[in-house]
């Protein structure tokens, strides 16, 4: 099999796994609270990446592996900051899922893809006209998807929008530090930090018990092991042989799979108006990722 074809298949599987994870998160919270879900799933995700790091080191595939104590300190510090941002974003997403559907959550969360180049303007990066048009289209699509009669918006949709904004800053920070870091180690640290912060919220605001956690072991294991460890590993391997623009397009299908699995697995369908909103948002997401055409001279 051609390397790029294999990479595309891995990235498509990655998007499918992440899309189904929205269902796992939603179903898991029928038994445990958002903080408990976060603490358990991200702890498992961190554990799964430990052997992945070991294998990558043995194969010589690790990139920017920390060689000195200073490198390790910088890696831990960057991972901690990523973990705080990930905790804030996923906590809003978890609470949002209590008051919105899986499909809506998937598409609204995916707005970070449109937001990232806009935030880049703050750091001196230019955003072309197409990016702003895509942002406007995404806002209109979100209006069709989330705004009901009487201009009412579900609280869960607003929380998920906040999640998308936080994921935007999370991605921008990773983009700034990742060229100097080992990506898998960075992710492993952020998972454990996110789990620790979620555990604090779990013990302060919730009343976790092993019976409830055991009752939703499958959603927790799926969200932690598959969405965290397996999908992330697929992403790392797949992106090696696929052009960045194509990789982003494939992974943005996560929102489509979230809506599809929400409908198939738990019967959360979307109305015609909401489907049109999804289509507009997805088109905006795709167009925002296409490379800018270079002008001659």
What are these regions (language model features)?
Residues 19, 23, 83, 87, ...:
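Hydrophobic/small/kink-forming positions within alpha-helical transmembrane segments
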Residues 1-36, 84, 88, 92-95, ...:
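Glycine-/small-residue-enriched transmembrane alpha-helix faces in small-molecule transporters
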Residues 42, 50-51, 57-58, 216-218, ...:
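C-terminal-most transmembrane helix of multi-pass membrane proteins
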Residues 45-49, 116-117, 152-206, 234:
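Transmembrane alpha-helical segments that form core, pore/gating elements
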Residues 3-8, 30-39, 68-75, 132, ...:
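Juxtamembrane helix-entry segments on the extracytoplasmic side of multipass membrane proteins
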Residues 21-22, 53-109, 144, 224-242:
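Specific transmembrane alpha-helical segments of multi-pass solute transporters/efflux pumps
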Residues 49, 127-147, 167, 198, ...:
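Hydrophobic transmembrane alpha-helices of multi-pass small-molecule transport proteins
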Residues 15, 38-40, 105-111, 174-195, ...:
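Helix-helix packing/entry segments at the starts of transmembrane helices
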């Amino acid at each position: 099999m051609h390397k790029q074809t294999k990479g595309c298949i891995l990235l498509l599987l990655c998007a499918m796994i992440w899309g189904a994870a929205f269902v796992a998160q939603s179903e898991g919270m029928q038994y445990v609270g958002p903080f408990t879900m976060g603490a358990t799933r991200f702890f498992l995700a961190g554990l799964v990446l430990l052997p992945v790091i070991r294998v990558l080191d043995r194969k010589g595939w690790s990139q920017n592996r920390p060689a000195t104590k200073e490198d390790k300190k910088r890696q831990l510090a960057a991972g901690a900051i990523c973990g705080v941002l990930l905790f804030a974003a996923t906590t809003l997403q978890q609470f949002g899922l209590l008051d919105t559907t899986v499909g809506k959550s998937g598409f609204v969360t995916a707005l970070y893809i449109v937001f990232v180049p806009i935030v880049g303007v703050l750091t001196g990066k230019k955003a072309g006209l197409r990016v702003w048009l895509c942002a406007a289209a995404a806002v209109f699509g979100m209006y069709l998807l989330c705004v009901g009669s009487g201009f009412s918006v579900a609280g869960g949709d607003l929380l998920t929008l906040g999640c998308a904004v936080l994921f935007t800053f999370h991605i921008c920070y990773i983009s700034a530090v990742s060229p100097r870091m080992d990506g898998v180690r960075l992710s492993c640290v952020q998972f454990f930090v996110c789990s620790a912060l979620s555990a604090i919220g779990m013990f302060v605001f919730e009343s976790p018990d092993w019976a409830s956690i055991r009752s939703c072991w499958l959603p927790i294991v799926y969200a932690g092991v598959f969405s965290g460890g397996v999908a992330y590993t697929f992403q790392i391997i797949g992106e090696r042989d696929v052009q960045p623009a194509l990789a982003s397009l494939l992974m943005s299908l996560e929102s489509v799979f979230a809506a599809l699995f929400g409908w198939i697995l738990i019967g959360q369908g979307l109305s015609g108006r909401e489907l049109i909103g999804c289509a507009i948002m997805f088109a905006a997401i795709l167009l925002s990722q296409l490379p800018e055409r270079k002008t001659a001279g």
